[in-house]
UniProtKB/Swiss-Prot annotation:
Activity-pH behavior: Optimum pH is 6.0-8.5.
Organism: Bombyx mori
Name of protein: Phenoloxidase-activating enzyme
Signal peptide: 1-21
Pfam families on file: CLIP, Trypsin
Keyword Signal attributed: yes
PANTHER family: TRYPTASE-RELATED
Disulfide bonds: C24-C75, C34-C65, C40-C76, C78-C126, C88-C117, C94-C127, C164-C305, C203-C219, C356-C377, C387-C416
SUPFAM superfamilies: Trypsin-like serine proteases
Free-text note regarding domains: The clip domain consists of 35-55 residues which are 'knitted' together usually by 3 conserved disulfide bonds forming a clip-like compact structure.
GO molecular function: endopeptidase activity; metal ion binding; peptidase activity; serine-type endopeptidase activity
Binding site for Ca(2+): E237, N239, N242, D246
Amino acid sequence: MFLIWTFIVAVLAIQTKSVVAQSCRTPNGLNGNCVSVYECQALLAILNNQRRTQQDEKFLRDSQCGTKNSVPAVCCPCNAADGQQGNCVNINSCPYVLQLLKNPNEANLNYVRGSVCQGSEQQSICCVTAPQSTAVTTTPRPKRVHACQSEMTATPPNPEGKCCGRDIAVGDKIVGGAPASIDSYPWLVVIEYVRLERTMLLCGGALISGKYVLTAGHCVKGAILDVGTPKTVRLGEYNTTNPGRDCVSVSAGGTDCTDPLVKIGIEKTIPHPDYQPYHFLRKHDIGLIRLQSIAPFTDFIRPICLPSTDYTVNPPSKFALTVAGWGRYLQFDNGTVRSSKIKLHVTLPFVQRDVCEANQKPLRNGQRITLWKGQMCAGGEAGKDSCKGDSGGPLMYEHSKKYEAVGIVSFGPEKCGQIDIPGVYTNVYEYLPWIQNTIEP
C-alpha cells in the first residue's frame, strides 16, 4: 500500500492546487465541479444544440450552481482520460485507478494523469464505474498519406496549394467562446515558458511552416521575459492539463482522440526590430519563433496560410473573423494567467480602424490611441472577443475553404468582451515582406 501511495503522490503532485473547485452534485447524481459553463463540454453541447428537448432544458436549469465572473456556472461532471463521465472522488476511493497504479507503465500513468479532477480533496480522480479499456477505442479515421509532409520546410507553403489553412474538423463548430472540435485549427501552438524549473503556458502562436511559428512581439520581448523564457512549443494540443492523448465523445458514437502531443524546442525568437515593448501603441507587435526541428504534418498539426491580400482595404461583405486558443494571456498588474484548459474559439465582426480608434478608451493622461495600417480591429460584442484566443495567437479568416492568419492578438480592453470596444490586432499582411526576408532555410 505504501508503494501505491508513493505512485499516487508522484502522479498527482504536479496537478494539485492550493485552491480546489467547489464540489457539487449533478442532476443525475454524479459528483462534479461548479465551473463556468464555457469550461464544461458536456453541458455546452446541450446548450448549443438547437434541437434540444424540454428535458434537456430542465437538465441545464437544474445544473446551475451560481456564477463565475458574471458568467453562469454549472455543475459539470468530470471526464476520465478515455472520455467517459465519472465521479470526482479521492483517489483512494477508486478501485480501478488503484489497480492501474499497481502496474505503473506509461499507458496506465497517462490514464491516471488524464483523469485528475478538482474535487473537494486535493488528490481527486475522475472515477468511472465501468471504465473502458485503457487502450482507448476511437472513432476510425481514414488512413492518410500526407503528401504535404514534403512541403514542411522552413518556407511557408504556397497558399494556392492544399498544404496550408485546411483542417478536417468533423461536425459543426460552436461559436461564442465554446469548445472547438478536437481536430480544428491544427496550426495553433502553445508556447511554454520556463523559470526556476517551473513551466508556464503564457502565449500562443500559429504554425506557418515546418520551422516557424508566427506570434506577437510581446510574447518574445519585453516584460514577459521577466516571468519566463520561451523554451518549447506544443503542437497538436487540445486539453492543456492532460499529458496524454486527448479524447472526446462524438455524436456518431465512440471516442475521437488526438495523436500524442508533440513538443519541439525553440531555436531562437525573433521580435520585429521596430517593436517597442513598453510603448502604449504596441506598433509592430509581431514576432517569429524558429523551431529546432521540422514539425510533422498530421491531422492535428499543419500550417495556416499567410494572408493573400489586405482585407482591411476593401473588406468583404459580412466580414467575419475567428480567434481560437486557450484564452491565455499574462495580466502584468497582478501576475496571474487567465486561461481555459481546452481549446476555444469565437467568431468576431471586423471593425474599421477609424471606428475602432474612436471607441478605444483614452489613456490615463487623456491621450487618444491612434492606430495605423499595421493594425486592425475586430470584436466589440458583449462576451465575445480575443479572450477566447491566446495572446499572440492568430486572428483568422476563412476564404475559399482555407484559413488565413490575417491578424495577431495584440491588445484590447482590460475587461474582456465589452460592448463597442474592439480588440486590436497586428495586421499580418503589412509584415509579409519582413516575414519573407526573416525566414531562413
